[in-house]
Amino acid sequence: MDTRPLIGITMGDPASIGPEIAAKALANPEIYALCRPLLIGDSRVMARAFETTGVKLNLNPVATPAEGKYAHGTVDLIDLPVVDMGTLQWGQVQAQAGAAAFAYIKRSIELALEGAVDAVTTGPINKEALKAARIDFIGHTEIFGELTGSHDPLTMFETKGLRIFFLTRHVSLAQACRMITRDRVLDYIRRCTAALEQLGLVRPKLAVAGLNPHCGEHGLFGDEEVREIEPAVQQAQAEGYNVSGPHPADSVFWHAAQGRFDAVLSLYHDQGHIAAKMYDFERTVSITAGLPFLRSSVDHGTAFDIAGTGRASAVSLEEAIRVGAKYAAAFRRTR
C-alpha cells in the first residue's frame, strides 16, 4: 500500500507563472518521495509550460485520482480544458484565465471533500482576472471558505518552522485597529490553538503580538493592549489555553523562530507578512486552517511580468507541497 499522501495541486491562473512553476516542481524527484502529486489544470497549457521551461516530462490525463501513476517523470493531471488556446496570452489579465483558475480550485475542493485527495496545494491566481470573470471573491481563502461552508477560515504562514496567524487581513490599517477587540482576540486564540492541534501539535504555545510600540507602555502611547488584548489573553489562560502576550511585535517573531513559541497571532496583514518574508521570502507558505481538509499555497502572485519566460522559481510551490505533505497525515488523524 502506498502511504504517501495524495496532494491535489491546482495549476493557478493559466496566463501566469503557475503552469511553469508546476512543471519545474514536478520535475523534482524529491516531491515524489514525499507525496503523490496530482495536478489539476489544462494539459494543453502544461504542454506549453514544458516547452517554455525545458523540462522533460510526460503527461497522463486522468479522470479520477485512482488512475494516477504517481511516479517521477509522468505528471498525472485532472484535465479541465476550458480556455481557448488561440486567444490565451501569457502575462495578461484575462477573464477566461480567471474563470479557468476558479474551475481548477472548485474541482480540487470537490476532490478533497470526497476524500479523494489528502490535501490541496494551490498555485497563484489573479484577483483582477477573477473580477473580469465575474467571480466575486478576493482570493483563495474566501473561495475555500465559501465552497466548503467554513466560517471565517484562518490564514497561517509557515516559514521554516515559524508559524504566523492573522487577526485581520485585507482591510485598511485603520479598520484593522478598530477590529482589535477583546472578543475577536479571544475567538482567534481559541481557533488558532485548535488549528495547531489539528496539525498535530500537542498543547501548542501561542504568542499574541502587540499593536503599539513596546505594547503601548501601559497605555502611554496607545491603550489597545490594556483595553482589549490583555483581557482576552487572561480569559483564554483562565480557560486553559497555553497563550501569552501581548508581546512587543519587534521581537516576538524572532522568539518564535527560536522555538520559544509554536505560533504567533499577528494583528494585521503587514505585521505578519513582513516577519515571514524577511525570514525567508521564497519559502513562506500559506496554510488555510478551519477547513474540512488541509490547504497550502504559494505565497506569491501571478508574476505576469515574467510569465512565459521560463525564469520563475518553483521554490515556493515546492515548499507548499512539502508542507502539505508534512501535515496531511496528522490532519487526517484529527479530522
Swiss-Prot record:
Binds 1 divalent metal cation per subunit. One of its GO terms (molecular function) is oxidoreductase activity. A divalent metal cation binds at H170, H214, H269. Its EC number is 1.1.1.408. It catalyses: 4-O-phospho-D-threonate + NAD(+) = dihydroxyacetone phosphate + CO2 + NADH. Keywords: Carbohydrate metabolism, Metal-binding, NAD, Oxidoreductase. Its cofactor is a divalent metal cation. Catalyzes the NAD-dependent oxidation and subsequent decarboxylation of D-threonate 4-phosphate to produce dihydroxyacetone phosphate (DHAP). Belongs to the PdxA family. PdxA2 subfamily. This is Putative D-threonate 4-phosphate dehydrogenase.
